Amino acid sequence: VTAGGVPVVDHGTLALGRRLGQGGQGTVYEVTNKRVTPPQGGGWDAVYKEYTPPVLAQLDVAALETLVGLPGGSTAAQGQWLCERTAWPAAVVRRQGVTCGFLMRAVPERFMFDLRGLGNTVVGRHLANMEYLLNDDAYVAGIGLVVSDRDRFQLLADLAETLDRFHAMGVTVGDLSPKNLLFTTAPRPACFFIDCDAVRLRGATALPQAETPDWEVPAGERKATPASDAYKLALLAVRLLGRHQTSTDPAALASYSPELGRLARAGLGHDPAARPEPGQWTAPLKAASRKASTRPAQGNARPGRPRTGAPPGGAGTGTPPPRRTQGVGVAVAVALGLAALLVLEAQDDDTASAPGASAG
């Protein structure tokens, strides 16, 4: 069913499976009888995010509907790209005519990894949040991640290109942080955005803008603008190459490439108009990647303690440092599901398909 070209699903038609996660904004459930399909075909299993009553009281329903309608209102190629690379809301869900949440796709398997703990044992499958990479190489290798310097530069280049395309579409991320970014290194380094119901689209935002601690723009600056995204891209570049979660010192980045050091210093400046746009980072990052080591980070069999923000349970859990506030969504809670798409296809209730399977 569509309303004004926006896919709408009645809550009563959803066959909900297990609860996948719960966060400050709501709860995410497996959906066993729906599929989400992007503009150019293919499809993924669906999950459902139900907002809490306090969040619903702040929700701009029209802005959420505009987000859902963006892939279909773009060119087929552009909509497909958005659906494949981001957690874009796929359909509005209503209960008795009132919006209560939205559908989204399952996280691609390649953006998850086998988390290892004490004794090099596999703890389970976890989202590959970029936050894990803001620690020293011994910790990264110890929890089971295989990442080289070249991978880090290529991840940043992919992120810069993605932000550049976002901005051309009128999308600003706002709460751009490693908690809201997933990554993979195979078949090539790439990022995947989650918590996309929190972005700003053409000036409108479905939810009040919030920021992850230590990833805030300078005081007094408007949130979720191209300039704020540029600031946080510079922060991430500094911290990803510096293996640090709170640093603002571009020295480590500059040691790889003086040009990248200059971009970082300009990007962290307090004059929003003087910050380099994401597209200006792409070529220098790719150039640095060609010179960077391809040797994966090495570590001990037991994961070490993260340099900052270690989890309360101590090292060895492999858990990224916890968010100190409620945050912008159910980023980690969304463990298995995110959004992207347009057309919803019903399946037989007893035939839930595997993640990544094509629609049929």
Describe the residue ranges of each PLM region.
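Conserved protein kinase catalytic/activation segment
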Residues: 180-196
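C-lobe/activation-segment region of protein kinase-like
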Residues: 191-192, 196-266
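Conserved N-terminal boundary motif of the eukaryotic protein kinase catalytic domain
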Residues: 9-19
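Regulatory extensions appended to serine/threonine kinase catalytic cores
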Residues: 293-340
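Terminal C-lobe "cap" of eukaryotic-type protein kinase domains
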Residues: 269-294
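ATP-binding glycine-rich loop module of kinase domains
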Residues: 25-92, 98-101, 106-144
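C-terminal region of N-terminal signal peptides and the immediate post-cleavage residues
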Residues: 339-358
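Catalytic-loop of the protein kinase fold
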Residues: 154-156, 163, 167-185
